[in-house]
Amino acid sequence: EPKLGELRRTIAEAGFTVTSVAAIYAGESYADVETVRRTVGLLPPATRAERIADTKRCADFAKALGGAHVSSHIGYIPEDRSDPDYQGLVTALRDICDYLKPTGRNFNLETGQETAEALRTFIGDVDRPNLGVNFDPANMILYGTGDPIEALGTLAPWVRSVHCKDGNWPPGPGQLGQEQRLGDGQVGIERFLSKLIEIGYDGPLTVEREVPGEQQMTDFLYAGELLKKLKAKLGVS
């Protein structure tokens, strides 16, 4: 509790608002597509119960930081809706959403590992009003699951938060694409912002850049300036 209080003070003094907290689980690996299927999110049955409990602890932490929403990669959603793992994910998400509901918060699914149509179907099957989408356009490209601008239109009613991130398409089947500095990849960031305006999105633009060391901060600052320029060009504040 003392450390939490110190963290809250540090955040306030820096002028930040915590809008979302990501649930990340021990044992996950994004080395390649097959490893992602085996290790990431709530999909693996052997770790599902433990990770649901971890997600609820993450939700408690987010609440203590001021009521932030929670987001996560839940893993590859099976295409077959009769698959036991599909049903297991539906049950898990209902449990998590119901846990968040009394405090008026959302659980947001991060895009990338399935098509927009498959994610839309899954959201309908979970059937919880506080289940939304954290839309990451780069992930759609990195996993090769669809054009991000088109996908944003499909998922528009559920988009509660977004990542401003860029990347290139995978070089071949079973491989992942390569993340790039914002504006240097194949997302088309200006088109992405234009589409956000078109669908009426007015939430935060969260820059994500997964590189080590000082390069990450350099790229964060570059992305911030790029977004300011593009927003001015598009006539939005």
Regions found by a protein language model. Give the residues of each.
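Residue-level preference for long, well-ordered alpha-helices that form the structural scaffold
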Residues: 1-3, 44-51, 82-85, 89, ...
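A cross-family glycoside hydrolase active-site/sugar-binding cleft signature
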Residues: 19-24, 71-73, 108-112, 134-136, ...
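Aromatic-lined substrate-binding rim segments of carbohydrate-active enzymes
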Residues: 1-15, 20
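Histidine-acidic metal/acid-base catalytic patches
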Residues: 5, 12, 66, 94, ...
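Active-site acidic/histidine proton-transfer and metal-coordination neighborhood
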Residues: 13, 28-132
